[in-house]
Amino acid sequence: MPLSLSNRDQNSGHLFYNRRLRAATTRFSVRMKHDDRKQTAALALSMVLVAIAAGWMMLLNVLKPTGIVGDSAIIGDRDSGALYARIDGRLYPALNLTSARLATGTAGQPTWVKPAEIAKYPTGPLVGIPGAPAAMPVNRGAVSAWAVCDTAGRPRSADKPVVTSIAGPITGGGRATHLRDDAGLLVTFDGSTYVIWGGKRSQIDPTNRAVTLSLGLDPGVTSPIQISRALFDGLPATEPLRVPAVPEAGTPSTWVPGARVGSVLQAQTAGGGSQFYVLLPDGVQKISSFVADLLRSANSYGAAAPRVVTPDVLVHTPQVTSLPVEYYPAGRLNFVDTAADPTTCVSWEKASTDPQARVAVYNGRGLPVPPSMDSRIVRLVRDDRAPASVVATQVLVLPGAANFVTSTSGVITAESRESLFWVSGNGVRFGIANDEATLRALGLDPGAAVQAPWPLLRTFAAGPALSRDAALLARDTVPTLGQVAIVTTTAKAGA
């Protein structure tokens, strides 16, 4: 008898009948609102995933067993958090992670194990660098920016300025602005008087009336403020502003009949303006209105005004540049009221693609950063520094500021790359030995270090030098280093 084979529709109906019968017996309903096939598939998939995860964990346990020292160079105690440097099969307690990395010569992470695992190994004395940072994250800022600021005390007082060192670009923050080209600040340092103008400082003699009159300065009205050595060293300097010494001054000129050497000449320009010249033995030199006033204030040779000459006289007279006055101001200065605007800063900025740095002077009623950054200011403990110290009173490291640097000079055209430093978030600079073993252990590339001017960089607190040799020094205990201060807590302050 031939077989009676079922077709596709019969099979589907039979399976449907079985599912409906199963639903009726298990759920007491034949409406089949829930598909058992999907639940079965999900359960099977879950079991497969669990099996895969369990197998992966077993494989990891074989390849890298948890809680076993193995070949790890840096070991950490799970319970206490203590770190050990594994050297020649012996575990040496390390002061911090940076010291452990330097001592072992590796930049790896600690392997955390139980105390029982550590007890299996012989131990040695304490190694490491006291005060070294626990971690050294590197911020590669687009611009290397540094500043030092003085906030002056009361006018005519002996109050010393509060010095703030800033790492990171400054924007003014609504409290300070660039010192205008026609503005000046009268300051004193170490018994001498200076004028800060045009991003630089120039020494003056306040008793020289020719200089003060030409500057627009009345010493009886404008009082100088004392500046710190940090700000003084950070400002580019010019030669002193004094009356230029003109050779053979007062002798008759061979170029302009009736005029004397050292006298000031004035010529009208095509645009209706005036250009000043000083008559020298070998010709005439173009000068600014400030230098013209300065020369005439010293000796006008009886003339009430500069002698006006026609352009043809200048054409037939040699143009020279023998008088060194190129660094003098262009005109009179408007002196800042330091009682209203007591904060003065010098900033240094340079991007990696810049041919030279940019130096600027800021002045205003407060630090040139947003007020929201004031809470990030760290007051350094070393407030009892010597008078000649350049260490700041307080520091501010702005978010994202470049912190792996190589020192260079304060000259804007400086291209040197000298010592390596890493600056912490609390304003401590750590010198880094420029050798392969140290750099490899710290995971640093000296080529990635950005330039930073040493006159500003040295105002940050000095931390210990970081090197592999220093990290391998063994000791029984750590003596107290540097200055200390008591941290005042809220509970203690209210007691």
From Swiss-Prot:
Localization, UniProt: Cell membrane
PANTHER family for this protein: ESX-2 SECRETION SYSTEM ATPASE ECCB2
Protein topology in the membrane: Single-pass membrane protein
EC number annotated for this UniProt entry: 3.6.-.-
Transmembrane segment boundaries: 43-63
Keywords (A to Z) from UniProt: ATP-binding, Cell membrane, Hydrolase, Membrane, Nucleotide-binding, Transmembrane, Transmembrane helix
Major localisation: membrane
Pfam families per record: T7SS_ESX1_EccB
InterPro entries: T7SS_EccB, T7SS_EccB_R1, T7SS_EccB_R3
The family this protein is said to belong to: Belongs to the EccB family.
UniProt name for this protein: ESX-2 secretion system ATPase EccB2
Top-level taxon of origin: Bacteria
Main function: An ATPase.
